[in-house]
């Protein structure tokens, strides 16, 4: 019997896969636990529509991320940090601080975990990488200006 998996099932397949299962296994295990449904023409049509909509949505998200990456590319984030005479900062600048400044200066929400950088402890200019989507990232600069 052909069935459509509604959830990931070990040793059978992933959600959305159409597989062959024995009649007893499908009726007595997969259907009662809502792990699968019968692969009728209507159900297959619905599944194909869902997959097409997901594909379109991912493509739109990818294009939006690429446009955002082009906008943010080589932008400079300026930070005024209290520093001593030798340029060493009182405290440190972390990815959380940079994410807040990106939101403030460019009105773009970026998760702090998506910013690849070392903690900044000395005034200067630093290169960072911002990951906007799994395959899309952009380079930015952080300029730390010492303030007495």
UniProtKB/Swiss-Prot annotation:
One of its GO terms (cellular component) is ribonucleoprotein complex. Keywords: Ribonucleoprotein, Ribosomal protein, RNA-binding, rRNA-binding. Pfam families: Ribosomal_L9_C, Ribosomal_L9_N. One of its GO terms (biological process) is translation. InterPro entries: Ribosomal_bL9 (IPR000244), Ribosomal_bL9/RNase_H1_N (IPR009027), Ribosomal_bL9_bac/chp (IPR020594), Ribosomal_bL9_C (IPR020069), Ribosomal_bL9_C_sf (IPR036791), Ribosomal_bL9_N (IPR020070), Ribosomal_bL9_N_sf (IPR036935). GO terms for molecular function: rRNA binding; structural constituent of ribosome. Gene3D superfamilies: Ribosomal protein L9, C-terminal domain, Ribosomal protein L9, N-terminal domain. Binds to the 23S rRNA. NCBIfam families: L9. Belongs to the bacterial ribosomal protein bL9 family. This is Large ribosomal subunit protein bL9. It comes from Clostridium perfringens (strain 13 / Type A).
